[in-house]
Amino acid sequence: MNKVSLLAASVAIALTGCGGSDGGSNSANDGVVITGFDGYFKHAVVFEDTNNNGQWDTQETFLGLTDEKGQLTLAAKPEKTLALQTLVPNGAKQKQLIALDAKKYAGTYTVDMDHPSQAMAHEIVFRAPSSSNVISPITDLVAIEMAKDPAISEE
C-alpha cells in the first residue's frame, strides 16, 4: 500500500505544478484544456482510449491536435481514459490521421517543443486517468498501475 501512496503523492505534486497560469488574461471559461507534455508536444493526437490498450485505434474518438503549448481545448471533459499519440513523418499513426482528412492533415507530425526544428523520432502514447487534464509520462505510469490493479482508485 505504501507504493500506491507514494505514487499518488508523486502524481499530486507533479500535477499541482502543472496548473499554473501562463500569464494570459483570458478569464472566460471556454472549456476544458488538456495539456500533453514531456516537453510540450505540438501536433500530437489527443484521443479517448476507450478499450484501454494504450493505442490510438481507428474506432476511437479523435479529439484534436495539440498546439505549440501542448494544449487542446475541449468543450467538455470526456469520460473515458484520455491519451496522447505522437506522430512521426510517414508513420502508421500519421497515415491514420491523414485518412480522416487528407487535405487538412497531410504533412502533419509531432514536434517536441524542446527541439522545435525536429520531428519526433518515435510514435509514443501517454495516457492519463479520466480525472486528469494533464497527459504525461507520469500520468501514463499512473494509468498503467490503475489498469493492473482495479483496487487502485484515482482518489
Model regions: which residues?
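Sec-dependent signal peptide recognition
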Residues: 2-9
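C-terminal motif of bacterial Sec signal peptides marking the signal peptidase cleavage site
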Residues: 15-17
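Feature for extracytoplasmic/surface-facing segments of secreted or surface-associated proteins
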Residues: 21-155
